Amino acid sequence: MKTGFGVASAVLGAVVFCHAASAESFRLAEIQPKDRHTTKYTCATGRVLQVTYWNTANGQSFALVPVKGQQLLFVNTLSASGVKYQAGSYTWWTKGPRADLYDAMNGEDAPPVLSDCVTIIR
């Protein structure tokens, strides 16, 4: 599991740079993207989030999630239910059309920082 965090830390700067340079590009020579999609969510607070997901040829998945004014690269990790992505102390946990954002710095039993984020369907 630490390897996933190491990869996320190592490529975070490159991905943020790539994202800033072009919202369409996500290029790392070592990791070949298979598909990409962007989903908009409306959270219980009324905040709207735009999250971009990548699935890669090697089976990894990434999510680019806006947190405190920055785009953070999250890497998928083991989950008993749904898909869980982690970046530093943050966890972005999706289950079907819903998602929650947690910050481990707030404590193990703390409520989500953003909760009940639901996919906007057009």
Where does each model-flagged region fall?
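Positively charged n-region of N-terminal signal peptides that target proteins for export
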Residues: 1-4
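N-terminal secretory signal peptides
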Residues: 23-73, 107, 114-122
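Mid-chain, structured segments of secreted extracytoplasmic proteins
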Residues: 68-106
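Bacterial N-terminal signal peptides
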Residues: 9-16
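Short amphipathic alpha-helical "recognition" segments used for binding
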Residues: 6-8, 120
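Amphipathic alpha-helical interaction segments
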Residues: 13, 49, 62, 93, ...
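N-terminal signal peptide c-region/cleavage motif recognized by signal peptidases
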Residues: 18-20
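Short, low-complexity intrinsically disordered segments
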Residues: 10, 52, 90-91
